[in-house]
Amino acid sequence: MLQLHPSDIKDVVLNGGVIAYPTEAVYGLGCDPDNDTAIQKLLAVKQRPWQKGLILVASEFSQLLAYVDESQLTDEQLELAFSKWPGPFTFVMPIKPHVSRYLCGEFDSIAVRVSAHEGVRALCQALGKPLVSTSANLAGEDPALSGDEILNVFEGKIDALVLGQLGEQRQPSTIIDARSGKILRNGQ
C-alpha cells in the first residue's frame, strides 16, 4: 500500500484506486465518484451493501453540481446548506438522473458535504471533483482513528493511505434532508 501526501494521490484515485484518508473525525475510505468499478471495490472492501448509498465530500459546492439536481431545491433550502458549509454537516439532496446507483443506493437523493478539513479539501482540489467518502471500517465495526489501524484492517485491500491529521471533531457529521430540513442524524 502506498503512503502518500494529498497532492500525490490524484493518479491513484483517477485510475480506479480506493484510498484511506484522514477526515474531520475518523479515517475515511474514498474513490472516484465517476468510476463504478472503484465504487464497487470500495463497497466490497468495507463489506457495505450498495443499497445504503454513500456520501460525496467536496472542497466547494460547485464540485457537487454534476451530481446534485439543485433545480429541485429552493433558494432557502440551498441557503441552509450554504450557511453550514464548509463544516460537519451532510445534506441529502436530489440527484441528477445519470448518478450511479452505487452512489445513491436505493434512494432518489445523495448525501453531500463541503468539508472544512484541510486535508480533505486538498484532496478534492487536486482531483478537481468530489470524493466518495465513507468511514474506514468494516460494516458494524468502529472506524479507524490512525494510519496503523488502516494498515491492520485494510493492508492489501486498498491502494493508498493518505498521510495527515484527523480533525478535532469527535462525532460524525449531522445529516439533514435539504428538502424537508429534517435532521436525519444528530452529529457534532
From Swiss-Prot:
The keyword Hydrolase does not apply. Residues 3-188 form the YrdC-like domain. One of its GO terms (molecular function) is L-threonylcarbamoyladenylate synthase. The keyword tRNA processing applies. GO terms for biological process: regulation of translational fidelity; tRNA threonylcarbamoyladenosine modification. It comes from the Bacteria. It catalyses: L-threonine + hydrogencarbonate + ATP = L-threonylcarbamoyladenylate + diphosphate + H2O. Disulfide bonds: none annotated. GO terms for cellular component: cytoplasm. Pfam families: Sua5_yciO_yrdC. It is an enzyme of class 2 (transferase). It is found in: Cytoplasm. Keywords: ATP-binding, Cytoplasm, Nucleotide-binding, Nucleotidyltransferase, Transferase, tRNA processing. InterPro entries: DHBP_synth_RibB-like_a/b_dom, Sua5-like_dom, TC-AMP_synthase, TC-AMP_synthase_SUA5. Its EC number is 2.7.7.87. PANTHER family: SUA5, THREONYLCARBAMOYL-AMP SYNTHASE. Required for the formation of a threonylcarbamoyl group on adenosine at position 37 (t(6)A37) in tRNAs that read codons beginning with adenine. Catalyzes the conversion of L-threonine, HCO(3)(-)/CO(2) and ATP to give threonylcarbamoyl-AMP (TC-AMP) as the acyladenylate intermediate, with the release of diphosphate. Belongs to the SUA5 family. TsaC subfamily. HAMAP family: TsaC (MF_01852). This is Threonylcarbamoyl-AMP synthase.
